[in-house]
Every structure is written in C-alpha cells, then in structure tokens.
C-alpha cells in the first residue's frame, strides 16, 4: 500500500527495471501495477490515509535478491544518480552471514528496501 500512487508507481517502475524485474501486464494495471522476476511478483496499491512505520505491526522491510556484488554496486550507483537516499551500503554485512553484500534505501513512503547478494 502506498500513500501517493502516481509517485510510487513512477519510483517502482524505475527501480524494478533497474534490478531486472519486468512489468506484469494485467487488466487494470493503471490501478494495481505489478512487476515480476522469475517466480516473484511485487504489487502496489493506493492505501488508506496514514503514515507507514517500520516499528509498528506489519512490514519491516523488503529485500530483493541480487545476482552478484556488481549488481548491488550498479543499483547503488543508480540510486545516487536518481537522488534516492541510501541508508547504508553498499557493503559487506558479516553479522548476517559470510559474504552478505547489500545496499539499504527507502521508497517514497519511507519503507526500507534492500538489494542483497548472498553467495552460494
């Protein structure tokens, strides 16, 4: 759920293209846009009024899987070029697991997003 549908649709349309997701074309895409990659789909919808908080019951953050560390670095570069604030990274997070490499940032509603590579 998003507060400003047009703003979020534009943000996610650009972000999903940058990480290799494609638009999922379905009826009413203008009201319920979605993007997919492999077997994962991601959808947004206009929310009721109110402000998101990751410290309340519900969503803490969304993590997307990156195919490589280079892909994480490319997205971080894209985030900076598009003036999207990076919370932290890209860097190694050894406290998670060996080789965990990620960048964290926020969407227009303040929802924390992560793009991470975890070596096999």
Per-region residue spans from a language model:
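Glycine-centered tight beta-turn/hairpin loop motif at sheet-sheet or coil-to-beta transitions
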Residues: 39, 108-110
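A short acidic/small-residue loop/turn micro-motif
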Residues: 94-95, 118-120
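Core segments of cupin and vicinal oxygen chelate
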Residues: 1-42
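Vicinal oxygen chelate
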Residues: 3-7, 63-108
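Short glycine-/small-residue motifs
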Residues: 113-115
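Long, continuous compositionally biased terminal/linker segments
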Residues: 36-77
């Amino acid at each position: 759920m998003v507060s400003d549908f047009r703003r979020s649709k534009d943000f996610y349309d650009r972000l999903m293209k940058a990480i290799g997701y494609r638009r999922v074309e379905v009826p009413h895409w203008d009201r319920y846009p979605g993007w997919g990659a492999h077997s994962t789909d991601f959808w947004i919808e206009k929310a009721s009024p109110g402000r998101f908080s990751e410290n309340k019951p519900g969503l803490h953050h969304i993590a997307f899987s990156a195919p490589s560390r280079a892909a994480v670095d490319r997205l971080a570069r894209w985030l900076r070029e598009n003036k999207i604030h990076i919370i932290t990274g890209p860097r190694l997070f050894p406290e998670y697991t060996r080789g965990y490499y990620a960048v964290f940032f926020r969407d227009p509603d303040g929802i924390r997003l992560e793009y991470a590579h975890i070596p096999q």
